[in-house]
């Protein structure tokens, strides 16, 4: 079977999924963006399934968005007419940045839910949330994000990592990892941390700049509180492993979220996770951390709880969760979704 992923982004999720699919007998072509009409016609004989991931980049194009959105709708219709089977993984219910175009985003998602041959979500709560907003007659499969164990080097132990980062062995260190953007809740976290943390606590915040305003305010917070250590930009793998090895817990203080690869990264490296009770968080984390009611009070309580907790059982639970997230199993289950769509079992 031959499948095309679109759009493809520079993150490990799609590469790891493609590897799992390859071992399940599926050949994956990676399309960086919206395919042309010519590509759709030329490849129909050899490609059975178009697997859509993050839809935003297929129909949004700054000032050209009206034309890009129309092109997306035309290609979507053409793909249906040509007989491609269409699968969508709903990584989120709505994009993290709506750019004032909520009706457009909702229309695209209603279209996908109505016409895709299959939809994949990463947890049961995500399925309920998606179907409540966009009812759908066809199948909606639950397939989790796979483990990221082994993705980063594992050569540094806790003591070595802390020494290289200039961190005290006695400090309580939290880590937030991933794109720096408004939906991540990092400004709330910085404020709550500054107001409640002990003198030797440290908050590591690392990730790419995806919102200049958020980064500017975080820089100000870090300048005012030296316990907040901010790394803005690309984080090399060797540095990621130091952060993961040095941290006592991963904090994912989202304002809104469905599912999170950064949470799975933390679990994969044995870190207890602190996250709000939103989307898939409770299902992803299980006994491997603290899930809190969204808001300042809930976050403050969760930070206190994770610091005081016996984190060894949480760390063991995190690794056990990740061990059950095999990409071979996820590839096999995803291939079954494709085959059901192609066989008309939808």
Q: PLM features: what roles do these ranges have?
A:
Residues 114-153:
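Donor nucleotide-sugar binding/catalytic pocket of nucleotide-sugar-dependent glycosyltransferases
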Residues 131-132, 147-164, 170, 182, ...:
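Acidic anion/phosphate-binding donor-loop and adjacent secondary structure
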Residues 160-163, 312-325:
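A short, well-ordered alpha-helix in the C-terminal region of glycosyltransferases
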Residues 168-184, 190-193, 204:
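Conserved donor-binding/catalytic core segment of Leloir-type glycosyltransferases
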Residues 202-216, 233:
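Glycosyltransferase donor-sugar binding loop
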Residues 215-241:
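Nucleotide-activated donor-binding/catalytic signature segment of Leloir-type glycosyltransferases, i.e.
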Residues 242-258, 268-271:
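Acidic donor-binding loop of glycosyltransferase active sites
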Residues 289-297, 304-310:
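Conserved acidic donor-binding segment of nucleotide-sugar-dependent glycosyltransferases
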């Amino acid at each position: 079977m031959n499948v095309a992923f679109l759009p493809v982004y520079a993150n490990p999720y799609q590469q790891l999924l493609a590897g799992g699919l390859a071992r399940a007998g599926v050949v994956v072509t990676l399309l960086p963006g919206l395919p042309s009409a010519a590509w759709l016609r030329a490849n129909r004989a050899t490609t059975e399934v178009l697997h859509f991931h993050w839809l935003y980049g297929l129909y949004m194009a700054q000032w050209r968005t009206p034309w890009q959105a129309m092109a997306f709708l035309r290609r979507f219709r053409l793909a249906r007419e040509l007989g491609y089977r269409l699968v969508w993984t709903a990584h989120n219910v709505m994009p993290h940045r709506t750019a004032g175009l909520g009706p457009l985003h909702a229309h695209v998602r209603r279209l996908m839910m109505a016409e895709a041959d299959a939809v994949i979500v990463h947890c049961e709560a995500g399925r309920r949330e998606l179907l409540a907003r966009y009812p759908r007659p066809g199948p909606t499969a639950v397939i989790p994000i796979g483990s990221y164990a082994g993705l980063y080097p594992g050569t540094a132990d806790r003591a070595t990592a802390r020494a290289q980062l200039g961190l005290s062995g006695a400090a309580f260190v939290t880590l937030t990892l991933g794109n720096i953007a408004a939906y991540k809740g990092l400004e709330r976290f910085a404020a709550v941390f500054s107001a409640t943390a002990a003198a030797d606590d440290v908050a590591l915040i690392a990730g790419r700049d995806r919102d200049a305003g958020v980064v500017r305010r975080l820089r100000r917070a870090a300048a005012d509180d030296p316990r907040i250590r901010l790394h803005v930009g690309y984080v090399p793998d060797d540095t990621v492993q130091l952060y993961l090895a040095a941290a006592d817990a991963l904090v994912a203080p989202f304002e809104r979220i469905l599912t999170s690869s950064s949470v799975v990264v933390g679990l994969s490296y044995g870190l207890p996770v602190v996250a709000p009770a939103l989307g898939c968080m409770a299902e992803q984390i299980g006994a491997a951390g603290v899930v809190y009611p969204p808001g300042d009070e809930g976050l403050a309580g969760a930070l206190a709880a994770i610091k005081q907790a016996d984190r060894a059982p949480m760390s063991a639970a995190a690794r056990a969760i990740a061990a059950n997230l095999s990409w071979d199993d996820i590839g096999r289950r995803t291939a079954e979704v494709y085959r059901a769509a192609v066989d008309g079992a939808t």
